[in-house]
Swiss-Prot record:
GO terms for cellular component: bacterial nucleoid; cytosol. The lineage of its organism: Bacteria, Pseudomonadati, Pseudomonadota, Betaproteobacteria, Neisseriales. Keywords: Cytoplasm, DNA-binding. It comes from Neisseria meningitidis serogroup A / serotype 4A (strain DSM 15465 / Z2491). InterPro entries: YbaB-like_sf, YbaB/EbfC. This is Nucleoid-associated protein NMA1657. Its main location: cytoplasm. Binds to DNA and alters its conformation. May be involved in regulation of gene expression, nucleoid organization and DNA protection.
């Protein structure tokens, strides 16, 4: 199916793709995304590798939530989910560019 030169070229392309994907993954690990809830009263900053870097809770919310711990917990959870979803979307867009046009499952070989 492939000649020696063709197979060698294909392997070289695969290695280059793998290197490029590793660079993209490293960049994503440093890319910060912000999720929020309660119209910005709770903000969470995380990387596309799901490392939470910062949680910001409005002082107004802290005073308001003094009597409603459950509301504060719900807002933190919602902001965390928002950040996670944005991180996943960003990572999928970035990594999807490498596997576009490949048969399903083949892109997993390069991860």
């Amino acid at each position: 199916m492939f000649g020696k030169a063709g197979l060698g070229g294909l392997m070289k392309q695969a290695q280059q793709m793998q290197e490029n994907m590793k660079k993209a993954q490293a960049k994503l690990a440093e890319t910060e995304i912000e999720g929020e809830a309660g119209n910005g009263l709770v903000k969470i900053t995380m990387t596309c590798a799901h490392e939470v870097r910062k949680i910001d809770i409005s002082p107004d919310l802290i005073q308001e939530a003094a009597d409603d711990k459950e509301m504060l917990e719900d807002l933190i959870l919602a902001a965390l989910k928002s950040a996670r979803d944005k991180a996943e979307e960003t990572a999928n867009k970035t990594m999807g560019a490498f596997t576009q046009g490949l048969p399903p499952g083949v892109g997993d070989f390069f991860r």
